Each structure stands twice: as C-alpha cells, then as structure tokens.
C-alpha cells in the first residue's frame, strides 16, 4: 500500500470509454492522459500500458477493463477503458456499472456497428443516464456530409435506448492525431464537455457500506487486497466487513484503504479503491462477491424478478423461451447460470415481452429487492431485469 495520501480537494467522477472494437477507445484514453500529463494533471499512460495483457497486445484489442486516473482544473476523474470486442462484453458490463457517465466512441469512418448498439443498451441497463459522443477518426473522412450522417445515426440510436439523443453533446476529433501531438483540440473540447455536461454525482453515503469485488491481489507480508468501486455507504480502517456470495460468508477487518496508489483515511460511494483485509487468504475471496457492512446483506439463490426481453432488432433472441430455460445472469461483477420458471398463467415469453420470472441461480449471490441484472446467452444480451422479491 502507498505512503502518498489522496486529497479530496475536487469532486470525484467515474467515467469511461465504451463502443465498438477498434473504434479508438483505448487510443482516446491514452491521448487524454498524455495531454493532461503536460499540465501535471495526469500520469501519461501509453496505449500498451492500458492494453496490458499479452493477448491484448497480440490481438490489438482490449479484453479487461483498465482504470486510469486524471484531473481537470475542476474535477478528479477515474476513467474505465471498456473492451469493445463481443467476446468480452461481460467485462464491459462490470466496467460500465462503475460509471457515472460514459464516453461513447464512434468511428466517423465506420459509423454505428454491432457493439456500438449493444454498449448503448448495456449502459442504460446499468444505470448510466448520460453519454457524451466522441466521433473519432474524423481525419480519415473527406466529406463533411458523411460525418453529419453518422452523427444523425448515433443520435437516433441514443433516442431509441432512452438517452436524450437530441441534446447529447458530440465532439469530433482524432485520438491518434492527438496522441501523436498534431491535433489536440478535440481532446481539450471533450474534457471541457465532461466538466460542463456531467453533473456532480450524488453519492449514496448514508446507506450501509457495499462494494462489489472486481479484483483480488496479494501483498506479501500484508494480506489480501480486494479492489472495486464502492456502491454505497462509507468505510474506515479498522472497521469490520462481511465477504458475501458464492461461498460461505466470512468476516474481515480492514487494515488499509487506497485509491490510485494513494492512501485514504476513509472510502465512500463512488470511490475506486483497494481494501486491505486482515486474516483473509487469496483463496477465500473472489471476483463476484461483495464486501458489506455486517448484517446488512445476505446471499440468496432464488428470487422473483421483473424483466424485459429484448427484441431481435435490439440484438436479442429470435424465438420464445419456456420454463426451465437456462441463460447466464450478470450481477455487478459476476455471472451465474440459473434457470427460469414462468408464472402459472404464462406459457412462454416472446422477444419484446415485459414479464415476471422466478429465477433460481446455481450459486447464491448477494442480492436484495431492487438489485439489477442482465440476462445473456450465447455471447449476446437477451434481457434486463430487477429483483422484486427474495424467495430463498
């Protein structure tokens, strides 16, 4: 853990880049840090530092979500770079669930593509209410009319998924040119729009502490660190938490708190933190569990839910499903197989239906009434739901 202290002298906002594979999300993230590093407001992160894994480097695509930190004159931003490849959408869901607002990156050269649409849908499902659009690769397009058509297409898409497409700000630029230092105007404009268009988030600090575990690391001689974004509440060093879901519930004492390699005296809703846990070994905690105030939450495996099943046009199923259908259910940072039971008077569920479902999961998950989830099958999102009542 670090010896530097994190200063809370600016509003902290979580943002991130979403969009189709190869449209420039990671290049844009790298360009933002490079430009702000010249003003002392960020640490310059190269493309290779953001796309970290061997497979990412070999394939030139982002697989895992990556966090970087930067500041403007007005705010401190935690920025998640989300994978755009269809195979890694579950990691994108985890990243998007941590954002207060999203930057949708669309290549002006290619226009709207399948993951553009899916990411906009998922952003809405995980509770993002505002997007900013960065039209990238504008330097490759000679006709102004083409860029205008792409912008109209994206605005229509945003309206379709209940974002305000007419008022959403669009910024044009080239992330690659900005990274090369030849055209930084688009990036400066984007940062200006982030500061102005995205309101200061209202943090849910009064409710009991809850943090979904996104990653787990070991610090030799110190203990195990759980990383994630605090969903609600506050926590201090020496307080006790419960580790809930997937396995037997365990208790642990917090011995350290850190955000972007700087120490915290407390963590609160909205913070991206590492929490050092005393007496917990690496194999006793995993991604998909949650840390919570003792007694505030339990793990369950059967519940009643209200769901919307996507139409074929929205990228969902082409056909109906029946009782005992077994898709994947995505909660916060985990996915679990479960089976569906339809209510007695319902014979089948069609794409486009809103309906009540009884869901039974293979493993217990920390849930309560109001917990949101996505339903996926065969690499695509087929529905979105909310837990309405716990059964067992």
UniProtKB/Swiss-Prot annotation:
InterPro entries: EF-Tu_GTP-bd, EF-Tu_GTPase, EFTu-like_2, EFTU_2, G_TR_CS, P-loop_NTPase, Small_GTP-bd, T_Tr_GTP-bd_dom. Residues 19-26 are annotated as: G1. Its main location: cytoplasm. GTP binds at residues 19-26, 81-85, 136-139. It comes from the Bacteria. Residues 10-202 form the tr-type G domain. One of its GO terms (cellular component) is cytoplasm. Its EC number is 3.6.5.3. Residues 174-176 are annotated as: G5. Keywords: Cytoplasm, Elongation factor, GTP-binding, Hydrolase, Magnesium, Metal-binding, Nucleotide-binding, Protein biosynthesis. Residues 136-139 are annotated as: G4. It catalyses: GTP + H2O = GDP + phosphate + H(+). Residues 60-64 are annotated as: G2. CDD domains: EF_Tu, EFTU_II, EFTU_III. GO terms for molecular function: GTP binding; GTPase activity; translation elongation factor activity. PANTHER family: ELONGATION FACTOR TU, MITOCHONDRIAL, ELONGATION FACTOR TU-RELATED. Belongs to the TRAFAC class translation factor GTPase superfamily. Classic translation factor GTPase family. EF-Tu/EF-1A subfamily. Monomer. NCBIfam families: EF-Tu, PRK00049.1, PRK12735.1, PRK12736.1, small_GTP. GTP hydrolase that promotes the GTP-dependent binding of aminoacyl-tRNA to the A-site of ribosomes during protein biosynthesis. This is Elongation factor Tu. It comes from Phytoplasma mali (strain AT). The gene is tuf.
